[in-house]
From Swiss-Prot:
Keyword Chaperone: yes
Taxonomic placement: Bacteria, Pseudomonadati, Pseudomonadota, Betaproteobacteria, Rhodocyclales
GO annotation terms (biological process): protein folding
Organism encoding this protein: Azoarcus sp. (strain BH72)
Stated name of the protein: Disulfide bond formation protein B
Keywords: Cell inner membrane, Cell membrane, Chaperone, Disulfide bond, Electron transport, Membrane, Oxidoreductase, Redox-active center, Transmembrane, Transmembrane helix, Transport
Transmembrane segments: 12-28, 47-63, 71-87, 144-162
Location of this chain's protein in the cell: Cell inner membrane
């Protein structure tokens, strides 16, 4: 097994930077490519943001010993939560329901609800969670999210159970 480095700050800060890049890419797709996020996408964004914040706090704190395990545990729980949402969305994309479960699209909300009711729904996201609007290398955004949450979970497990350099 690969040993954990003595100074874990760069590792935590790299996780933060990676999460920030993922969130920035999601915002790019939303604002410049016109891909509206569904509620599950928004939940995954929150999970990536939380993974990033935990990693940033850990990077600034520079924990040792049990502190590394605490941050690793928090990262693991957050990655598993986000990964479960991404896995559910991946399942929905593979086996789409006959009636979309994620709620109405943006146009329908703006036409059917007063603005005061539509704004909170818009913030939560719009669109059908089973729709595949973007792919890269044959994988949808939900698939890529699942892979990234899986990588974060593996890193967290390494932090929890990896051999320490003395």
């Amino acid at each position: 097994m690969i040993a954990l480095p003595r100074n874990r700050r760069p590792l935590f800060l790299a996780v933060f930077a990676y999460c920030a890049a993922l969130l920035a890419f999601g915002l790019y797709l939303q604002h410049y490519q016109g891909i509206e996020p569904c509620p599950m996408c928004i939940m995954q964004r929150y999970a990536f943001a939380l993974v990033g914040v935990i990693a940033l706090v850990a990077g600034l704190h520079g924990p040792r010993g049990a502190g590394v395990r605490v941050y690793g545990g928090l990262l693991l729980l957050t990655a598993l939560a986000g990964g479960s949402v991404a896995a559910r969305q991946t399942w929905m994309q593979l086996y789409p329901p006959e009636i979309p479960e994620c709620g109405p699209g943006l146009e329908y909300m703006l036409e059917s609800f007063p603005l005061t009711s539509a704004l909170p729904m818009i913030f939560r996201g719009a669109g059908d969670c089973s729709a595949i609007d973007w792919t890269f290398l044959g994988l949808s955004l939900a698939n890529w999210s699942l892979l990234n949450f899986g990588a974060a979970a593996l890193l967290a497990l390494w932090l929890l159970f990896g051999r320490r350099v003395r």
